[in-house]
Amino acid sequence: NINDYKADINNKNLKYTIDIHNIKKYFYWGTSVLITQIIILWFTQPKIIIICLLYFFISILYNYYLKQKKYFDIFTISVFHLIRIYYGSIAFDVDLSLFFIVFCGSIFLMIGANKRLVEIYKKYENRPYNFDDKRKIEILQIIFGLIAILIFLLYSLNEKKNIYFENGNIIYLNLVIIILMVINFLNSQKNNHQDIIEFVFKNKINSVLGILFFVIFLSNSIFL
C-alpha cells in the first residue's frame, strides 16, 4: 500500500525504496495486470473472476478505509485469507467443510489480533490502536484461539468424519497438538512480540508441533 509506505519505512525498517512521486504509474501498472488476469480467467476459469474482483474490491476498501478502523481491520485480514483458501479449493476441485472454514477463520482472527498487539508494543505509526486497546486485543486473541480449539473438538466428535480416516480416535491426538500450538503461540508472543512470519521461522516448538500434526493427520487419512 503506497499510502502506508512512509510509516512502514519507520515501522519495519524497510531496506528498499519506492518513488512515491510515481503513484499513477504504479496504479496503471496494477490495473493493467488485473485486467490481463481477468481476460485470461474469462477464457480459462470464468468462475474465479468473481472471486478475483471481490478480493480486489476488498483490498481497495481495506487499504483506503478499513485499515484505520479498529477491529474491522482484523476481520478483513481474516477474510483475505479465507478468500485465498476458497480460490485454491476451486482451482484444485476440493470441497470445503463448514468446520474447516470456521476453524481457519478463527485461527486467522487470532493471528490478526496478535499482529495488532505486536504493533502496539512496537509503537507502529499510522495504526488505529494505542496502548489502551492492549487488554481488549489480548482477550480477543484468546477468544479466537479458544473458538478454533472448540471447532476442532466438534469436528473430532462428529461421526461423519470417520469415513475420511483409518482410525477416527487418532484425530483426538491432533486436537491435543492444536491445543499445544495455540498455547505455545499465545505464550511465545506474550514474551517476544514477533511478527507472525518471524514466529513461524524461529519458533522451533511450533515447527515440531506443526510437522507432527500433519504427519499424524495425513498418515491417518484414507486418501493417502
What are these regions (language model features)?
Residues N1-L34, K67:
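Aspartate-rich (DDxxD/NDxxD/DxxxD) Mg2+/diphosphate-binding motifs
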Residues I23, Q45, I49, K70-Y71, ...:
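Hydrophobic, aromatic-rich alpha-helical transmembrane segments
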Residues N1-N3, P46-Y62, C104-S106, N169, ...:
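Membrane-embedded alpha-helical segments that form the functional core of polytopic membrane enzymes
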Residues K25-F92:
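Intramembrane alpha-helical segments
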Residues L34, Y64, L82-L224:
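C-terminal membrane-associated helical module and adjoining short loops/tails
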Residues D4, D73, I183:
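Residue-level signal for inorganic ion chemistry
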